[in-house]
Amino acid sequence: DLENFADVSTSILKTLEKNGYIKFYEQTVERNPFIHKVIDSSSKLNLTDEQKSAYDAVEEAIDDCMNSEFLLFGVTGSGKTEVYLQLIEKVLNIGKTSVMLVPEISLTPQTVDRFIARFGQDKIAILHSKLSVGERYDQWYKIKNGEAKIVIGARSAIFAPISDLGLIIIDEEHDSSYKSEMIPRYNVKDVSRYLAKEYNVPIVFGSATPDM
């Protein structure tokens, strides 16, 4: 590839290297899906009494390593996301990783931007169907190496290679897209419950119209 790019033969390149004119080396370059984003940072907001009550209940489960389930009930714009953000910050502060699942249709740039504004790009990995194969590989590698402590994605993100899971959040938990009809068929809730039990961590389900 280099020979074609420079339009020279391999022998010429080796001669230049031998005489010290050039140097060959390998370097990993991450394909970053956030590369063009410039987002102002944001500070956490004061929680209302209801939000604080919900936060405190989940925080206790995180501190006690309890495999518990919580339903955060509220319509769009009621402040569920701020509770998510502060719970993720709690998990981040104890050195563990959070998984934030959202329906594919809701995984908009605006959704991701809010998390980047709070936590920065370096701590976040994103997994969804619109990533290139290379981008997906790099995000997966970032998670496996422990560089990303916040994983945001659609249903397949539940299979991310996390070794220090601290919290699972499933937003819009009633959404039918959390059930995969393709082989292998699976329900994100079932997989989440299994992982939460294995790691002794809580799951937060968020919805305005909870699945019965």
Show where each model-derived region lies.
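Accessory, non-ATPase domains that flank or precede helicase/AAA+ motor cores in DNA-metabolism machines
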Residues: 1-191, 195-207
